[in-house]
Curated annotation (Swiss-Prot):
Its main location: membrane. Heme binds at C475. Its cofactor is heme. Belongs to the cytochrome P450 family. Its EC number is 1.-.-.-. It comes from Ampulloclitocybe clavipes. It is found in: Membrane. The keyword Cell membrane does not apply. It is a multi-pass membrane protein. Pathway: Secondary metabolite biosynthesis; terpenoid biosynthesis. Keywords: Heme, Iron, Membrane, Metal-binding, Monooxygenase, Oxidoreductase, Transmembrane, Transmembrane helix. One of its GO terms (molecular function) is oxidoreductase activity, acting on paired donors, with incorporation or reduction of molecular oxygen. The chain crosses the membrane at residues 7-27, 222-242. This is Cytochrome P450 monooxygenase claO.
Length: 538
């Protein structure tokens, strides 16, 4: 290419970029004109806004949002990347309205959809509107109470397989054995979703190598460079940047390849079993429903691409997002910090189940302190700290209490212009002192047993929590995660006592380890490790 042509091409490129930026500016000004002008924190960076501060620098994003809500009211504006802004709502009435319009009135941002598509494909997490409703309806029978009841034995089987491995380890040093509990919770989650969802045993509890687990875990083994972080944050405005070959983006592609390969193998095996009658495929199992949807000539039909994407989603959810592994790890951390609460839970469990295991019904309704511990962990440690969506249409969001706008006007609702980014700070709402009291940041399961508890809490999510979100996108696997969490924890606490391995059981600092989603880790450990001293309960 001649120099003149290079200059001409460069000028055209600059002109196109200018037009693109101009169109974005006009669109942003239009949205601002239709959106109620709200107060909010000052911008810290023209490039990142407050996005980097919230997602990278702040120790507790929930506490940050809570402080802003106290200063600016139940809805406020937060500066984003390249001069953009987001509306954050910390009001129960507003949040209920927001979640009720999910997949239609409020949809995922282009970056979120690109990220989801890159990781798992065009499945339930990616879809919106009628496509989301169709896919969710096709999968719902696999997560009914009847289905979870049948799967409870799988969770106990995995628990006892882990117990056998731990007992073998404890034989050599019964009083001073330290075990990285997070690693074993990873194994339980992967094997349970494999058997319960796909009739496939990954064998990680038996020490078998799993490519899927290795790729999942590799997300937490790299320290993202400044360049990678910049690309990830700028992708909020320019989703196409997710295609650049950064370490993180390459890992995403590798994860998608491995999960899709495994999904293809499991699907093909199940099809052959069904056709040749060499095995039995339960039609209401996850993989059975997917096979049924593939052949159905009804509104619930799913394409091959959608089916593989659903399996990728289930592997991701079962191992990472709503997996009980993170909940279980946090439960063992909190119970090690609070030995008296650990003893109280053990007493409840052993008073009823010394030689047998509780049924699904008993796990759900017959063990009040276990239920309280589980829900206190869900409250304090949601795996997803916030959700943001884009308004697909102009909207009016009602508020339960008035706020003062940027112009000084007092309003009881806020206008949202089409294209505005709106978010809910889940961790903030779950830990809000306004909703949960002055001890909201403390691990206190007893709060769930107090008379009248929750009567003044207007949050409409599961048990007044937003951990599983709410509305049309409520986590489909909530019952699965709760049953697995309770079953595994009931075995662990009956069979073992846990404490931190430092002198006198001293509590170390628990840090946030970055992976696909944050995981807990003990300060000073290499990777996402949570070592605890484990002893048998006599």
């Amino acid at each position: 290419m001649t120099p003149a042509r290079e200059i001409g091409a460069f000028n055209i490129l600059v002109f196109l970029i200018f037009l693109w930026l101009l169109s974005k500016l006009v669109g942003r000004l239009g949205r601002r004109g239709r959106t109620t002008p709200l107060r909010g924190p000052a911008n810290k960076s023209l490039l990142f806004g407050l996005t980097r501060y919230i997602n990278v620098e702040a120790d507790d994003s929930g506490a940050v949002y809570e402080s802003w809500a106290a200063e600016y009211g139940p809805a406020f504006r937060v500066p984003g990347v390249l001069g953009s802004h987001r509306i954050v709502i910390c009001d129960a009435k507003a949040i209920a309205h927001f979640y009720s319009k999910e997949t239609f009135g409020y949809v995922q941002s282009p970056r979120a959809r690109s990220t989801i598509k890159n990781i798992v494909g065009r499945g339930l997490l990616w879809s919106e509107g009628e496509s989301h409703r169709r896919q969710r309806k096709a999968l719902s029978p696999a997560f009914s109470n009847a289905a979870i009841r049948r799967l409870t034995s799988v969770f106990f089987d995995s628990s006892y397989k882990m117990k056998a491995a731990w007992d073998s380890i404890l034989e050599t040093n019964p009083d001073n054995t330290v075990i990285d509990v997070q690693k074993w919770m990873n194994h339980i989650s992967l094997d349970s979703i494999g058997i319960a969802g796909f009739s496939h045993d990954f064998g990680s509890l038996d020490g078998k190598h799993s490519d899927v687990a290795a790729v999942f875990d590799s997300f937490g083994s790299i320290n993202p460079s400044y360049f990678s972080m910049v690309i990830f944050l700028l992708a909020l405005v320019f989703p196409i940047l997710l295609k650049l070959p950064t370490n993180r983006n390459l890992l995403v592609l590798k994860l998608r390849e491995r999960t899709s390969e495994i999904a293809d193998v499991l699907l093909e095996r199940t099809r052959k079993e069904k056709e040749g009658r060499t095995g039995t495929v339960e039609e209401k199992s996850i993989i059975g429903l997917l096979i049924k949807a593939e052949s159905a000539e009804t509104e619930l039909h799913m394409s091959q691409e959608e089916i593989v994407a659903q399996m990728n989603v289930l592997l991701l959810a079962g191992y990472e997002t709503t997996s009980s592994k993170t909940f279980l790890t946090w439960a063992l951390i909190e119970l090690s910090k609070n030995p008296e609460k650990q003893a109280k839970l053990r007493e409840e469990l052993l008073s009823q189940y010394t030689t047998t295991d509780p049924t699904w019904e008993q796990l759900a309704n017959g063990l009040p302190y276990l239920d309280s511990v589980v829900h206190e962990i869900l409250r304090l440690h949601p795996p997803v700290g916030e959700t943001f969506r884009v308004a697909a249409e102009d909207d009016i969001i009602p508020l339960s209490r008035p706020l003062v706008t940027l112009s000084g006007q007092t309003v009881s609702s806020i206008a949202i212009g089409k294209g505005t980014m709106v978010g809910v700070p889940i961790r903030c709402m779950n830990r809000s002192e306004v909703l949960w009291g002055k001890d909201a940041k403390e691990f206190r399961p007893e709060r769930w047993l107090e008379p009248g508890f929750g009567e003044n809490n207007e949050v409409q999510g599961h048990r007044h929590l937003l951990t599983f979100i709410d509305g049309p996108r409520t986590c489909l696997g909530r019952g699965f995660a709760l049953a697995e969490f309770k079953a595994v924890l009931s075995v662990l606490i009956r069979k073992y006592a846990f404490e931190f391995p430092g002198p006198g059981g001293a509590v170390p600092k628990i840090e946030k380890h970055r992976s696909i989603l944050p995981r807990p880790k003990v300060e000073g450990q290499d990777g996402a490790k949570v070592p605890l001293r484990v002893r048998r309960v006599e």
